[in-house]
């Protein structure tokens, strides 16, 4: 497992709701936390590690063993209040930062790995992180929420990411979109089918 970088196909995939949690998925979630800590992040969404599943992990403390590890499965955001502009970055767009307007407060409802429903009212940085990670599940990146001027300012960096990915694909070191689509379909088949 690795953190995918822009413009990888799966980053733009609209994730499917999870209907099944098993030991293998729990292990993948543990790996997501490990990757997040290695990259000094506070959140990581399934799409960012090539899992097309509606789930993300968060720990506002950044460091393993500190803070609280939270898993959000099939999150639903509501009661967004107020607006606040703030600087954001993303583990899938390393070393790029930009101003994004987000709601100051948000209510989130989700499930944990035990299938228990929980909810929370968040504000400040926690609200921003939850909105950022939830966007990933819809194939939306923070750069999509920036002003036109902000996007233009980082256009050169984005083009470098695009050229690097094209080069990897040309060298056969990155799968084609069709190969990725097949793998995505396998994940969806395994974890997103209605219970019988």
Question: Model-found features: residue ranges?
Answer:
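Positively charged
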Residues: 1-196
